[in-house]
Amino acid sequence: MDLELFKKIFKYNERSAIPMENRVKVERIDENNYDRIFAISDLHGQYDLFLKLLEKIELKREDLLLILGDICDRGKKSYEIYMKCMKMIKLGYNLKFILGNHEDMLLEDFENDYPLNYETEYSIYKNSKYFEKKNIEKWHKENFYAEVKWLIKWLKDCPLIVCGNENIFVHAGLDLSKNLENQERENVLWTREEFWMDKKNTLEEYKNKNIYFGHTPNLDGKISKKSDKIYDIDCGAFFTHSLGCMEVKNKKSKGIREIYVHC
């Protein structure tokens, strides 16, 4: 059968070769819609650092804040950060959250009822002071799922990649030999490969864009420039007590800027 006829009959496209569970949700944005754009990653329960950063950058409703995954685990105020993010969204702030591998594990726990064992490593209440105020066993039986239903729904709707006019944001990394829609889920969530080194197979669409990722912590507490246009912005907040932020757009000035807060 002629390939073009095959495509028309079966509505074939490249994505159909990718198993559903491995498909990556890509959200495309117009960066011209925002006055300033900020990116942070891997908060890991460091709620106080998050508040310090919001105060320092003086986020406005005309701006955009991207969080590149891994709000939860390690630190003691994971759930508080999620609640703060949702409150900001409801108040009209532009905040986009990209799924991290720790959120992916959290969702898997809920799919398999692992939260019923509240001592599991990634249980939402083991990593949040919010739930320490409750009688866990009693609360579990009465309204646990009702209380966190909003969070699970929100996380399920989050993209794994956000692509703008000049910038790409992802949690762990990319395969630069594949376009965004053909990235593998496990790779964008988990990779620690030095993907920026594969210059020979890099597609043209990546050559003129900055790429920002997290997942692999910089234990000196600083943002790391991996190549001309690729940055690791995970400053290891839980370990270093330092949170780095990249201002990737400011309509009043040119270039990018690193911003830090400490506690």
Can you say where each PLM-predicted feature lies in the sequence?
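Conserved beta-sheet core of the metallophosphoesterase superfamily
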Residues: 188-261
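Active-site environment of divalent metal-dependent phosphoester hydrolases
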Residues: 44-49, 73-76, 102-107, 176-177, ...
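His/acidic metal-ligating clusters that form di-metal
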Residues: 141-221
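Divalent metal-coordination and catalytic microenvironments
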Residues: 42, 70, 85, 100-101, ...
